[in-house]
């Protein structure tokens, strides 16, 4: 769902984190994007500290002295979720990646080659046909189940809803919430899915669901998020990308009736990290059955160096809403940003855990902390934060609903309990240096092949529209000059009435600001968000 600020401001460093030189180099081509060093065993902190350069140790010690509470030692990995795996006979479909990899075809040169690229032999997918009448979430055809990686004991939960309109021809959309560590079932029941959950646990129909004109897959990832589970962990974005490619490959192989339609990846918040990597992973496979046509990122975190500069303006009345902080607090943030920027630049240059973790902890405390301490909602600058730690009571209602035995049985969930956000995962990603890595560097490669939409509700603080617009304009790509010349134009529902936002577009790149929308645009502006989706999928901005 969102960037979890409680983990942002705590960031408790554990007794074991990644070694200093676990470096993720960003690719000149999709095929160069590899998991690489991230698959290596984690070292103990005490051992890894011995490898630090003097400069890196000085930075680490400096930030640790500033925020000692953020460097308390704690268990790095959470305990695995209790679960009970269902017998294969309880599933309607099971497809194995090894069977797909054994399919060979003859190419135009007469040579034999695999029909589909990728390392799939360790994966399988189990599917259950969900009876729409049992839960009443929607009347459309639904499937749920797990992608299994048997070698690493990873099990990712998904829930598919067919389009309400014309499923044989309508696009297919994958939705990803952020966190990292927040369930995409939050997006299903709070934002863009077929129904929401009321305070008393009832189902409420959503007329603006994104499956109005598209089939939608909601995926709980990485492992140990939502209904997903594993005895191991995924603590960086690139590692998670391999699972997404496998899931989609197996899904479209099992259900070829959806494979010919256009496919799009969408998400919000930390999905600003996920989506560039996941899309590039898909595009790196030239022989694939995934018809990826575009990506959509809402209120995302993609380029920290550019985006963190805009926390002070947003908090101090320059983002279109009244100031939350007073003059002295704003001045303190002005003074803090140069150090923050320097730390992020070090992270960008080295992509090292020992540079990126201090950057995350310093910048989050200095640039987000002053705002959060006011009690104002970081996801909506117009409101105070509610009683829930993530500011929305609806999360408690959704969590209670998804913990009902009859709900878990209906969708085939195998874990003992559901939680909306797993803060251990949030911390793990931060402590692997993933938070501040320059994922925007992947975007030019995407733009060379597919359209990219960056949209933002204008009332969000945590991933605000100022920063999102700024990074799209700062991005170096062949179309940068023309994109920056493009004017912001009114965005209207059906082209009529008052503007619900402003949009600029050039080539394959589009930025859209939604008026009076917070971090979760479909929650605050459901009609505008559906209009945005439908027009985007129709190619209005990039055809």
UniProtKB/Swiss-Prot annotation:
Name of the molecule in the record? Carboxypeptidase Y homolog A
Question: Which UniProt key words apply to this protein?
Answer: Carboxypeptidase, Disulfide bond, Glycoprotein, Hydrolase, Protease, Signal, Vacuole, Zymogen
What subcellular locations does the record give? Vacuole
Q: Give any Pfam family that matches.
A: Carbpep_Y_N
Residues bearing glycans: 122, 213, 508
One MF annotation (Gene Ontology) recorded for this entry: serine-type carboxypeptidase activity
Q: Which InterPro entries match?
A: AB_hydrolase_fold, Peptidase_S10, Propeptide_carboxypepY, Ser_caboxypep_ser_AS
Catalyses: Release of a C-terminal amino acid with broad specificity
Role according to the record? Vacuolar carboxypeptidase involved in degradation of small peptides. Digests preferentially peptides containing an aliphatic or hydrophobic residue in P1' position, as well as methionine, leucine or phenylalanine in P1 position of ester substrate.
* GO biological process terms on file: proteolysis
Where is the organism placed in the taxonomic lineage, from the top? Answer: Eukaryota, Fungi, Dikarya, Ascomycota, Pezizomycotina
Q: Which GO terms describe its cellular component?
A: fungal-type vacuole
Q: Which family does it belong to?
A: Belongs to the peptidase S10 family.
Cysteine-cysteine disulfides:
182-421, 316-330, 340-363, 347-356, 385-391
- Residues that make up the propeptide removed upon maturation: 18-128
User: What organism, scientifically named, is this protein from?
Assistant: Leptosphaeria maculans (strain JN3 / isolate v23.1.3 / race Av1-4-5-6-7-8)
Q: Look up the coiled coil feature and give its residue ranges.
A: none
Quick one: signal sequence residues?
1-17
């Amino acid at each position: 769902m969102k960037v979890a600020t409680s983990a942002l401001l705590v960031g408790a460093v554990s007794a074991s984190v990644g070694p200093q030189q676990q470096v993720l180099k960003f690719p000149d081509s999709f095929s160069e994007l590899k998991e690489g060093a991230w698959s290596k065993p984690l070292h103990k902190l005490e051992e890894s500290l011995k490898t630090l350069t003097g400069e890196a140790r000085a930075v680490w010690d400096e930030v640790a002295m500033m925020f000692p509470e953020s460097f308390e030692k704690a268990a790095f990995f959470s305990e695995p979720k209790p679960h009970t795996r269902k017998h294969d006979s309880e599933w309607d479909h099971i497809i194995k990646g090894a069977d797909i990899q054994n399919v060979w075809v003859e190419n135009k040169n007469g040579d034999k080659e695999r029909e589909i690229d990728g390392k799939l032999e360790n994966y399988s997918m189990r599917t259950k046909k969900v009876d729409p009448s049992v839960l009443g979430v929607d009347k459309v055809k639904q499937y749920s189940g797990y992608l299994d990686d048997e070698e690493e004991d990873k099990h990712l939960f998904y829930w598919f809803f067919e389009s309400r309109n014309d499923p044989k021809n309508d696009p297919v959309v994958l939705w990803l919430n952020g966190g990292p560590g927040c369930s995409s079932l939050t997006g299903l029941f709070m934002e863009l899915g077929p129904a929401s959950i009321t305070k008393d646990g009832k189902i409420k129909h959503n007329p603006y669901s994104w499956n109005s004109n598209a089939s939608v897959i909601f995926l709980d990832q990485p492992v140990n998020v939502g209904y997903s589970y594993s005895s191991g962990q995924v603590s960086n974005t690139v590692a998670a990308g391999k699972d997404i490619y496998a899931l989609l490959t197996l899904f479209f192989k099992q259900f070829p009736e959806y494979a010919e339609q256009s496919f799009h990846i969408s998400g919000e918040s930390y999905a600003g990290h996920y989506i560039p990597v996941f899309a590039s992973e898909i595009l790196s496979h030239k022989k694939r059955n995934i018809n990826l046509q575009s990506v959509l990122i809402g209120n995302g975190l993609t380029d920290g160096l550019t985006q963190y500069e805009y926390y002070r303006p947003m908090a101090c009345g320059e983002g279109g809403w009244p100031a939350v902080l007073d003059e002295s607090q704003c001045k303190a943030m002005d003074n803090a940003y140069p150090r923050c920027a320097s730390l992020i630049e070090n992270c960008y240059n080295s992509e090292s855990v020992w540079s990126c973790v201090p950057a995350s902890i310093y910048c989050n405390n200095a640039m987000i902390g002053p705002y959060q301490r006011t009690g104002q909602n970081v996801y909506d600058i117009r409101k105070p934060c509610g009683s829930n730690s993530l500011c929305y009571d609806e999360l408690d209602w959704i969590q209670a609903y998804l913990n009902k035995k009859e709900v878990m049985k209906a969708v085939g969930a195998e874990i003992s309990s559901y939680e909306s956000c797993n803060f251990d995962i949030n911390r793990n990603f931060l402590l692997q240096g993933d938070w501040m890595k320059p994922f925007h560097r992947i975007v030019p490669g995407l733009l060379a092949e597919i359209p990219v939409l960056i949209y933002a509700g204008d009332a969000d603080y945590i991933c605000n529209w100022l920063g999102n617009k700024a990074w799209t304009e700062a991005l170096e790509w062949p179309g940068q000059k023309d994109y920056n010349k493009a004017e912001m134009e009114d965005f209207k529902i059906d082209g009529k009435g008052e503007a619900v936002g402003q949009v600029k577009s050039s080539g394959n790149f589009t930025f859209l600001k939604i008026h009076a929308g917070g971090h979760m645009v479909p929650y605050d502006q459901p009609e505008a968000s559906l209009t945005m989706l439908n027009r985007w999928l129709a190619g209005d901005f990039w055809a």
